[in-house]
Every structure is written in structure tokens, then in C-alpha cells.
């Protein structure tokens, strides 16, 4: 059995930094017990200039879960329920931030979003 991973484009709210775009990339499927690695590429704004940069996911049935964020300073905060399995890092030279979720199971089947 595989864990289904869906990626979607998530953009800023209209009228507020409307040229900022966030684009997720990574695998569509990950096998149970493997690690999920996703990339969020930000255009139109430097991730070191401000804000916190988040990962969230939406489960089948539309339940949302906040996973964690990396602050523009580089500090991170994680959902306590995921803390033992999650890491969020960044590459400031590429204006990207990353999600790694270890030891995935079928319960991690969701659509994954990055957001500001």
C-alpha cells in the first residue's frame, strides 16, 4: 500500500503581497515507513525578510492540520503530535523551504500545502 501525496499551488491573499507565490514540489507517492520530502519555492518575496513559512496538510474529508513553520530568522516550531517525525529547513540562496516527514504511514495520506 502507498501513501498518496498531493501537491497544490498556494498563493498569497489578493491585495496583500499579491505577487508572492509559493509552489510545492515533491513526490506524488511515498511508501509507508519511508520519508516524505517536499520543497516550497517562494517567488516575489525573500523568506529572510519577514513572516513565518508554514506547512499544513488537508486530509480526505477536508480536515486541516498545521504541521509547523520556519520563521524568517530560521527558528522553527512544530505541531507537538508530529515533533518526533518532522523537520523544516530552508535554503536561503534558492529562497526555498523544505518539509521532511519521517516514517510515514497511510494516516499521512493528505494534500500538503506550504503557506505564509
From Swiss-Prot:
Residues 19-48 are annotated as: Framework-1. Residues 1-18 form the signal peptide. One of its GO terms (molecular function) is antigen binding. GO terms for cellular component: extracellular region; immunoglobulin complex. Residues 49-53 are annotated as: Complementarity-determining-1. GO terms for biological process: immunoglobulin mediated immune response. Pfam families: V-set. Keywords: Adaptive immunity, Disulfide bond, Immunity, Immunoglobulin, Signal. Disulfide bonds join 40-114. This sequence belongs to the VH3660 subfamily. Residues 54-67 are annotated as: Framework-2. Residues 85-116 are annotated as: Framework-3. Residues 68-84 are annotated as: Complementarity-determining-2. This is Ig heavy chain V region 1B43.
